C-alpha cells in the first residue's frame, strides 16, 4: 500500500505527531544544507562561521544570514507542508486548497484591508509590548525581553536596505517565502488537522493561529500576530482558497519592508512603525479601524459569493 494511503487513514493526532517530526527533520536538514552552501560559496571555514554570524553589522555576515534564513524558511515551512499534504491526501494542490482561485474582487478588498490595517496593527503591537507578567514570573519576563531585543537587532539589520536590490531580496525573503510557506503549513495543514481533530472549524482556526504566533518567538508581538493568524484562517474558511490568506500575508509583510525602505531613503516623512500611535494620530487610527473593517466585510462577501 502506498505510504500516502496509509497516512490518509490515520487519526489527526497521529498526523500531527508525524507533522512535527517532518518539520523538525526538514528544518534541521535545510538549515545545515544552507550553512554548508554559504561556507562553500564564500570560502569560510565552518569553525569560523559561528563567530562571524554574531556580528550582524558586518555586510558579509548579513549576506550569510540571509542565505541561511532563506534555506531555513524553505525547509521549515514550504517543504514540510508539501510533503505532509502528499502523505495525508496524495494531491498536495487539492489538500492545500491551491486549485481554487479566490475571486478577483475579494483579492482586491482584502488587499486594501491589509494596507489600511497598518495603524491598527501598530497599536495592538504597542499595547502588547507594554504588558507585564506577575512579579513571581520576573525572570521569565526578563528572558522574554532579552529574546525580543536580540530578535529586534537581527530584524533591524535585515531591514537595512541600501539599494533596490536589497529591497527586492527582502521582499522575496521576508514577504514572499513566508506568505507561501507559513500559509501552506499553518492554514493548509495545521488548521485542517485541528478542525478534523475537534470537529469544529473555529477550533482549527484559533489553534493554528496560536501556534503561528508562538512559532515566531516574539512575545511582545504575540497578540497582533495571533489575531492576524486568526484572520488569515477565516479568509481561508470564507473563500475555500489558500490564495486569499497568502495574498494578505504577503501584503502585510511587504508593506512593512517597503515602508522601511522608503523611510530609510527619506522618500516618506512619517515613521511607519509609529503610524497610528499617540493621541495626535487618533483620526488616523479611527480611519484605519473603519476602513479595515469595511474592506474585510466586502472581501468576505465577495469570497462567499462564488
For each feature predicted by the language model, list its residue ranges.
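Alpha-helical transmembrane segments and their helix-start/interface "positive-inside/aromatic belt" motifs
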Residues: 6-27, 97-116
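Hydrophobic core of alpha-helical transmembrane segments in multi-pass integral membrane proteins
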Residues: 23-32, 78, 82, 113-117, ...
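Alpha-helical transmembrane segments in multi-pass membrane proteins
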Residues: 35-88, 106-115, 136-141, 145-146
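Juxtamembrane helix-loop-helix connectors linking adjacent transmembrane helices
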Residues: 49-57, 94-177
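Hydrophobic alpha-helical transmembrane segments
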Residues: 61-76, 148-177, 277-290
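Membrane-interface helix/loop boundary segments of multi-pass membrane proteins
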Residues: 181-207, 234-240
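Functionally important transmembrane alpha-helices
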Residues: 213-275
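C-terminal membrane module of polytopic membrane proteins
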Residues: 250-306
Amino acid at each position: 500500500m502506498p505510504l500516502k494511503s496509509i497516512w490518509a487513514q490515520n487519526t489527526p493526532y497521529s498526523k500531527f505527531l508525524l507533522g512535527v517530526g517532518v518539520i523538525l527533520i526538514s528544518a534541521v536538514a535545510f538549515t545545515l544544507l544552507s550553512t554548508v552552501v554559504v561556507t562553500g560559496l564564500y570560502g569560510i571555514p565552518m569553525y569560523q562561521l559561528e563567530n562571524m554570524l554574531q556580528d550582524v553589522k558586518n555586510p558579509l555576515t548579513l549576506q550569510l544570514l540571509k542565505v541561511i534564513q532563506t534555506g531555513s524558511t524553505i525547509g521549515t515551512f514550504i517543504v514540510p507542508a508539501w510533503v505532509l499534504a502528499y502523505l495525508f491526501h496524495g494531491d498536495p494542490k487539492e489538500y492545500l486548497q491551491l486549485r481554487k482561485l479566490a475571486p478577483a474582487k475579494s483579492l482586491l478588498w482584502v488587499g486594501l484591508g491589509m494596507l489600511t490595517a497598518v495603524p491598527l496593527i501598530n497599536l495592538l503591537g504597542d499595547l502588547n509590548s507594554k504588558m507585564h507578567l506577575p512579579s513571581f514570573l520576573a525572570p521569565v519576563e526578563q528572558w522574554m525581553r532579552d529574546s525580543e531585543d536580540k530578535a529586534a537587532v537581527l530584524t533591524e539589520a535585515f531591514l537595512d536596505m541600501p539599494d533596490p536590490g536589497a529591497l527586492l531580496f527582502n521582499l522575496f525573503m521576508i514577504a514572499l517565502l513566508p506568505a507561501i510557506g507559513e500559509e501552506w503549513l499553518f492554514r493548509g495543514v495545521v488548521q485542517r488537522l485541528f478542525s478534523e481533530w475537534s470537529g469544529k472549524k473555529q477550533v482549527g482556526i484559533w489553534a493554528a493561529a496560536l501556534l503561528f504566533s508562538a512559532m515566531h518567538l516574539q512575545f511582545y508581538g504575540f497578540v497582533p500576530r495571533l489575531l492576524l493568524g486568526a484572520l488569515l484562517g477565516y479568509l481561508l474558511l470564507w473563500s475555500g482558497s489558500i490564495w486569499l490568506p497568502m495574498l494578505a500575508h504577503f501584503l502585510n509583510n511587504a508593506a512593512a519592508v517597503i515602508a522601511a525602505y522608503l523611510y530609510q531613503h527619506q522618500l516618506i516623512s512619517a515613521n511607519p512603525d509609529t503610524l497610528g500611535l499617540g493621541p495626535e494620530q487618533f483620526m488616523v487610527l479611527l480611519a484605519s479601524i473603519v476602513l479595515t473593517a469595511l474592506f474585510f466585510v466586502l472581501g468576505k462577501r465577495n469570497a462567499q459569493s462564488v
